[in-house]
UniProtKB/Swiss-Prot annotation:
The keyword ATP-binding applies. Pfam families: HSP70. One of its GO terms (molecular function) is ATP hydrolysis activity. SUPFAM superfamilies: Actin-like ATPase domain, Heat shock protein 70kD (HSP70), C-terminal subdomain, Heat shock protein 70kD (HSP70), peptide-binding domain. Belongs to the heat shock protein 70 family. NCBIfam families: PRK00290.1. Keywords: ATP-binding, Endoplasmic reticulum, Glycoprotein, Nucleotide-binding, Signal. Its main location: endoplasmic reticulum. GO terms for cellular component: cytoplasm; endoplasmic reticulum chaperone complex; endoplasmic reticulum lumen; membrane; nucleus. Residues 1-21 form the signal peptide. PANTHER family: HEAT SHOCK PROTEIN 70KDA. This is Luminal-binding protein 3.
Length: 663
């Protein structure tokens, strides 16, 4: 606040602000349809829905229950998921991944600066935010915000759910790391809007995983520690579970630590090895790095079950095949400091929760990186030999919990979920700047949300008519060491001696962990309020609207590509079926007159040549060509069937079955 003396609080005590818990079973029931649960991960995403009394984790169009969080652009189309990841080595600069590490961040953040050097695609500075520049079709350069790329992945999860459920889905619960700050949460919500989703609730990943663990657990109170180490982020949450009540006691973490960092260490090891052994530096060769990244991830996964793997890559550089062993011991040595780094947040969370190690009843492992034996061992050692619980699927637990929360919000959960109550917490302390740059805390970290707290401040100077409210998050005592979330002015305060006006500042954190701040002059009733988000990083409503339009255009473009491929397949199928029909003695070969056969074969030959010459024709061209071929072939086939007294179920179209997509 503009020159407000920290000690000049007129109401020294907070209006203790109702620290209220919330039951979400009845909330928003009327306006929500089926609410899906989406785990939007750094490396993989997953979607679930609560149906027929249990959660279904939904497989994508490739039959996989987790989908790579990858997006790629080629000269003709946009690819999402496996299709994007599988072509990354041949199209590195146009293949985007790890976008969760950029969302809600500033371009100058040290993590962003570090990541820029590690990814093959181009990250640029736009209005202080990291944006991704990529060539889309026809060589056109396009700039995307991290929210837009995340929206493409959310859109893929939405499509996956819609295909399974056979209906349109508008509402979702989306998960975020517990340690995500305000800007990152708001940016994730914006991504949902761009994807055409109403994000009914943002919930923390470890809390969602705790639901997956505790949904069917009855009996007394249990303290559980959720250790969530994923592809790009790390969270620790400590909860008490008691007959359906999930209360978060403390949370901690690192939003930039995960499996991708372990892969990077393997890559750096092999880059050095190649330089030493072959005198070749591949650190700037995006194609080689793409191949190496894929194999590093594969090797890391294999080392969870084996003690040694061989990393083999055909033609890694200059036509040279690469083959080198990697042992589990070497992998652990390369990542030793990162593995040990996970123990810091565990200790802090335990301190904040005020629990002894012996008071933790269960340790729940979430995230693919918890399969690493060394990580499990460190955790086991910290808890004096206690074995972690492996009862939840580490890849699916978060989406599972999100789907349960979705069913509570929609009212579709029924008796199974009606007693569930989530009491989550704000991960970081929230406060304002008072005189001398002091961080005056209004909402301490690990406060149960939603919550509302007010405090009265006054002016620092005589005749002061404006105060500036600067809102920060962080644990340090001075605002210069905390993160500025936003600021706004309250104008029109009547002139008065210093210390006279009473300005009430109210902080309200909603169930999504997003902060609203209001300042009111008690004398005049004049007030200002804002939803605090990373003021420079937040997308404006105009930008969100534009991105929604562009997302719809991309979806339309994707639809056109599919229709074009379907039309081509239809033509090809007809031609090959007809070719088979006129060439098969059991079908029409012996029944056609020479002139008829020649006419049909000529039409089919011409159609196949046309297909070869027109690989990227439009849908209408394929349809027109099909009509041309049918106009020649169908009358001849009909005439033959009539001459032979009709055929059982005689098709006049060469037996084409239009109802099935070809594989």
């Amino acid at each position: 606040m503009d020159r407000v003396r920290g000690s000049a609080f007129l109401l020294g005590v907070l209006l203790a602000g109702s620290l209220f818990a919330f039951s979400v079973a009845k909330e928003e029931t009327k306006k929500l349809g089926t609410v899906i649960g989406i785990d939007l991960g750094t490396t993989y995403s997953c979607v679930g829905v609560y149906k027929n009394g249990h959660v279904e984790i939904i497989a994508n169009d490739q039959g996989n229950r987790i989908t790579p969080s990858w997006v790629a652009f080629t000269d003709s189309e946009r690819l999402i998921g496996e299709a994007a990841k599988n072509q990354a080595a041949v199209n590195p600069e146009r293949t985007i991944f790890d976008v969760k590490r950029l969302i809600g961040r500033k371009f100058q953040d040290k993590e962003v600066q570090r990541d820029m050097k590690l990814v093959p695609y181009k990250i640029i500075n736009k209005d202080g935010k990291p944006y991704i520049q990529v060539k889309i079709k026809d060589g056109e350069n396009k700039v995307f915000s991290p929210e837009e790329i995340s929206a493409m992945i959310l859109g893929k999860m939405k499509d996956t759910a819609e295909a399974y459920l056979g209906k349109k889905i508008n509402d979702a619960v989306v998960t975020v790391p517990a340690y995500f700050n305000d800007a990152q949460r708001q940016a994730t919500k914006d991504a949902g809007v761009i994807a055409g989703l109403n994000v009914a609730r943002i919930i923390n990943e470890p809390t969602a995983a705790a639901i997956a663990y505790g949904l069917d657990k009855k009996g007394g109170e249990k303290n559980i520690l959720v250790f969530d180490l994923g592809g790009g982020t790390f969270d620790v949450s400590i909860l008490t579970i008691d007959n359906g009540v999930f209360e978060v006691l403390a949370t901690n973490g690192d939003t930039h630590l995960g499996g991708e960092d372990f892969d990077q260490r393997i890559m750096e090891y092999f880059i050095k090895l190649i330089k030493k052994k072959y005198s070749k530096d591949i650190s700037k060769d995006n194609r080689a790095l793409g191949k190496l990244r894929r194999e590093a991830e594969r090797a890391k996964r294999a080392l969870s079950n084996q003690h040694q793997v061989r990393v083999e890559i055909e033609s890694l550089f200059d036509g040279t095949d690469f083959s080198e062993p990697l042992t589990r011991a070497r992998f652990e040595e390369l990542n030793n400091d990162l593995f040990r780094k996970t123990m810091g947040p565990v200790k802090k969370a335990m301190e904040d929760a005020g629990l002894e190690k012996s008071q933790i009843h269960e340790i729940v492992l979430v995230g693919g990186s918890t399969r690493i034996p060394k990580v499990q061992q460190l955790l086991k050692d910290y808890f004096n030999g206690k074995e972690p619980n492996k009862g939840v699927n580490p890849d699916e637990a978060v989406a599972f919990g999100a789907a349960v929360q979705g069913s509570i919000l929609s009212g579709e959960g029924g008796d199974e979920t009606k007693d569930i109550l989530l009491l989550d917490v704000a991960p970081l302390t929230l406060g304002i700047e008072t005189v001398g740059g002091v961080m005056t805390k209004l909402i301490p970290r690990n406060t149960v949300i939603p919550t509302k707290k007010s405090q009265v401040f006054t002016t620092y100077q005589d005749q002061q008519t404006t105060v500036s409210i600067q809102v920060f998050e962080g644990e340090r005592s001075m605002t210069k060491d905390c993160r500025l979330l936003g600021k706004f002015d309250l104008n029109g305060i009547p002139s008065a001696p210093r210390g006279t006006p009473q300005i009430e500042v109210t902080f309200e954190v909603d169930a999504n962990g997003i902060l609203n701040v209001k300042a009111e002059d008690k004398g005049t009733g004049k007030s200002e309020k804002i939803t605090i988000t990373n003021e420079k990083g937040r997308l404006s409503q105009e930008e969100i609207d534009r991105m929604v339009r562009e997302a719809e255009e991309f979806a339309e473009e994707d639809k056109k590509v599919k229709e074009r491929i379907d039309a081509r397949n239809q033509l090809e199928t007809y031609v090959y079926n007809m070719k088979n029909t006129v060439g098969d003695k059991d079908k029409l070969a012996d029944k056609l007159e020479a002139e008829e056969k020649e006419k049909v074969e000529e039409a089919l030959k011409e159609a196949l040549e046309w297909l070869d010459d027109n690989q990227s024709a439009e849908k209408e061209d394929y349809e027109e060509k099909l009509k041309e071929v049918e106009a020649v072939c169908n009358p001849i086939v009909s005439a033959v069937y009539q001459r032979s007294g009709g055929a059982p179920g005689g098709d006049a179209d060469g037996g084409v079955d239009d109802d099935h997509d070809e594989l």
